[in-house]
Amino acid sequence: MKLLNLKIMNKKRLKDQLYLLVILEKNLIKLELLSFSNLIRRILLKEIYNFKVSTISIFLFNSNKFCYKIHEFTKVEEVKNNLVSFLILLKEIKFRSYYKLKTKRTFALLKIKQFTQVFLTDIILPNNFKILSIDNNLIKLNSLDINLKVLLELHKSKGYNFNPVKKVNYIEENNVYFEIYTNQTSTPLEVLVKSLKIIKLETYLAI
């Protein structure tokens, strides 16, 4: 017998979020003895892992193909934008990974050479990664002569800056009604199942 029956009541895509309304029907009395709803909410908001840009390294190549590392306050004449705003845009990129990776760290690469504009689509991603961010334009350049390489370290972790879950509401009556909002890097149903795995209840779940 399944401890939990999950019924999807509503799901939709909002402007920059995914929304899900579900009912969790609890079939066994022992689940009533747990602070079940609050536990799930706490796990959803604090324990869900996700990938995010953690470190950015920028390398500038000169005409002799010698490269050196520059920082966000370096003045680069060929770049219209300042590098600080460029790095902020890179840090805010939202990624979706379609397969579970064994590692908690991977890399993406952006090559800037002979372009006047650089877009999100120019980023070379690891296999099975997709960029979800909407703002496509990253940086504008004054010259085709510049040669930059930008290395993005993607780190998988949990906490406010990483968590795909933006908001969780619940009402507990005989059953539990959950409203879950995510930033699209994971679906609400995916994170709900992950939360049940953490407390080892996914094997008792019927959808």
From Swiss-Prot:
An example GO biological process term is: DNA-templated transcription
Keywords (alphabetical) are:
Chloroplast, DNA-directed RNA polymerase, Nucleotidyltransferase, Plastid, Transcription, Transferase
Report the GO molecular function annotations: DNA-directed RNA polymerase activity; protein dimerization activity
**Alphabetized SUPFAM superfamilies for the sequence:** Insert subdomain of RNA polymerase alpha subunit, RBP11-like subunits of RNA polymerase
Q: Which reaction does it catalyse?
A: RNA(n) + a ribonucleoside 5'-triphosphate = RNA(n+1) + diphosphate
Question: Which InterPro entries does the UniProt entry name for this protein?
Answer: DNA-dir_RNA_pol_RpoA/D/Rpb3, RBP11-like, RNApol_insert_sf
**Any one annotated GO CC term:** chloroplast
- Compartments in which it is found: Plastid, Chloroplast
Q: Give the EC number(s) listed in the UniProt record.
A: 2.7.7.6
User: Function of this protein?
Assistant: DNA-dependent RNA polymerase catalyzes the transcription of DNA into RNA using the four ribonucleoside triphosphates as substrates.
Subunit organization: In plastids the minimal PEP RNA polymerase catalytic core is composed of four subunits: alpha, beta, beta', and beta''. When a (nuclear-encoded) sigma factor is associated with the core the holoenzyme is formed, which can initiate transcription.
Its family remark reads: Belongs to the RNA polymerase alpha chain family.
User: What is the protein's given name?
Assistant: DNA-directed RNA polymerase subunit alpha
Annotated source species: Euglena myxocylindracea
Question: Which gene underlies this protein?
Answer: rpoA
